[in-house]
Structure formats: structure tokens, C-alpha cells
């Protein structure tokens, strides 16, 4: 459970911003969205495999950059 203690004379907007930042850092919203609906195990494997392929191609593209001419 993420908690944020509001400091004395602290505006609500700043406390809300700190709360949102802490939620984002813990990854709570992404996990909540992932668990909102049931996902079949085959769909999970397929999604993870596609992400791994995408990461691999991204890494290869960055390694094969042509030399800069300037």
C-alpha cells in the first residue's frame, strides 16, 4: 500500500503529484491494468515472446548504425 504523508502547509496538488510519482515508481497501475481481465497463459507467452523479439531487433538496430560523417 502506497502512502504519502502530507507535510505541514503543503498544497494538495504537490502531495497528489508525489503520490502519483510513488504509484508510478512501484508499478502498481501497470499491474492493475494487466490483472483487470484474465489473460490465457498462451497469450501471456505470446506477448512476452513478441516483446523479446522487439527488444532484440531494437538492440540490433542500435548496433548497426552507420558511422557519422560529420
UniProtKB/Swiss-Prot annotation:
GO molecular function: structural constituent of ribosome
Gene3D superfamilies: Ribosomal protein S8 (1.20.5.1150)
GO cellular component: ribonucleoprotein complex; ribosome
Pfam family, one: Ribosomal_S21
Disulfide topology: none
BP terms from Gene Ontology: translation
Keywords, ordered alphabetically: Ribonucleoprotein, Ribosomal protein
Cross-referenced InterPro entries: Ribosomal_bS21 (IPR001911), Ribosomal_bS21_sf (IPR038380)
Similarity comment text for this entry: Belongs to the bacterial ribosomal protein bS21 family.
NCBIfam families found in the cross-reference section: S21p (TIGR00030)
Protein name as catalogued: Small ribosomal subunit protein bS21
Organism annotation: Nitrosomonas europaea (strain ATCC 19718 / CIP 103999 / KCTC 2705 / NBRC 14298)
